[in-house]
């Protein structure tokens, strides 16, 4: 696995933008044979991105062929009827750990899990199996972030705010959650509904360790919909 210290990674992503480059099978940029996501990555890097967040073994392997930027890796896999699907079990962690990436992100919400574990026990199992792997907790509330950090994750991401039944539904970043996590002394990577550069600046000034922007950069369908909706108001 990528042997980078937490401190070195923080220094590398400081004052920059991590770009999430993903496309799921039902989305326009998904290609069965691959090849599209690396193009997005190259464009993001040329634009100044200092890191990449990516989904799936295939995409990450292709991305590593075109960039040496640090990667936050996930595997989205459904386990119905349970809701968590972002690196939701040890199976996905094992697959990501083989890819030599800097950070593995996992669903660390309090929702019922397919493996039946508490999130604290899951984190501890991952830490025991991969003690040198940096981990990011995708959470939706302050409590989830604090609990994940206490269980041993390195970074707390606001990725799932608004995507759990009990978190605020807003069309934009959860500034309050980001601020509260930072005030709690956690190493925060802000992510989720960061639509505009001004949002990123506000978040940066809250004291986060990193900022992930996805849809506003790499999902042209969503970007188009936002413009169309604006002119129809």
UniProtKB/Swiss-Prot annotation:
**Keyword Ligase carried by entry:** no
User: Which CDD domains does the record match to this protein?
Assistant: NanE
Q: What would be one Gene Ontology cellular-component term for the protein?
A: cytosol
Q: Which Gene3D superfamilies match?
A: Aldolase class I (3.20.20.70)
- Pfam families on file: NanE
What EC number(s) does this enzyme carry?
5.1.3.9
Entry superkingdom = Bacteria
Keywords from the named record: Carbohydrate metabolism, Isomerase
- The top EC class, named as a word, is isomerase
Task: Supply the NCBIfam families for this chain.
Answer: PRK01130.1
Q: What does this protein do?
A: Converts N-acetylmannosamine-6-phosphate (ManNAc-6-P) to N-acetylglucosamine-6-phosphate (GlcNAc-6-P).
Record protein name field:
Putative N-acetylmannosamine-6-phosphate 2-epimerase
Q: Which organism is it from?
A: Streptococcus gordonii (strain Challis / ATCC 35105 / BCRC 15272 / CH1 / DL1 / V288)
What's the encoding gene here? nanE
